[in-house]
Amino acid sequence: YGLLELAKQQQEEFALITENMQEGLIVIDKYTMILSANSSAWNLFHVDKVCQGESVYCLDRAEDFRRAIELVLGGEHAEIVLKLNGNDIQLIANPVVRGAKTEGAVILLVDVTEKLERENLRREFSANVSHELKTPLTSISGFAEIIQGGFVKAEDIPKFAGRIYK
C-alpha cells in the first residue's frame, strides 16, 4: 500500500464507523465551520448535508447552543441539553487542541428524551408514594401522640389501637 491508499482506506473506515453510530457526530474548525458530520447529526437537527462546509450555527441559532460552541472553541469542555424538534438532545463538546491552541471541536449529540422521561416518571412516582405514605402516617402519629399524652382513658386505648391498625 502506498501512503495515499492507506490514508484513503483509513478515511473510509472512519466514515463507515461514524455512519453506523446512533449518536450524532460533528467536527468543526476554530472558525465554526463544519468539517465533517454523520447522518445521525443531520437527522437530529432535521437538516440535510447542505450545512457541510458552513458554520455550525446553520444548525441551531439558540443562545445555549451558541454559548456551548463559544465555550468549546475557547478550549473548554461544554455539555448542555438542547430541545430539538420536541426531543431532548444532550450535546457534549470537546476542544481539539494542538500545542496550546484550540484548532476546533468534536461534538457528540445523544438523544436523551426517553431517559429524561423515565427520570421524570420515577420522580413523580416517588413523590406520589411519599405523599400516600405520609397521610396515614400522620394519622397514626396523631393517635399515638394522644395515647402517649394520657388524653385517652385506659378503657379507650384498645379502640384507638384498632383505629391505628386499620
Please provide the spans of the model-predicted regions.
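Conserved phosphoacceptor histidine of two-component systems
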Residues: 19, 127-131
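Short, charged amphipathic alpha-helical "coupling" segments at sensory-output junctions
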Residues: 1-16, 114-118
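Sensory-domain boundary/capping and coupling elements
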Residues: 116-127
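N-terminal capping loop/helix in small sensory signaling domains highlighted by a polar->aromatic N-x2-3-F motif
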Residues: 36-45
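Short post-phosphohistidine helix in the DHp/HisKA domain of histidine kinases
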Residues: 133-145
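PAS-family sensory/regulatory modules and their coupling/dimerization elements
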Residues: 49-114
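Short acidic helix/loop segment immediately C-terminal to the autophosphorylated histidine
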Residues: 148-155
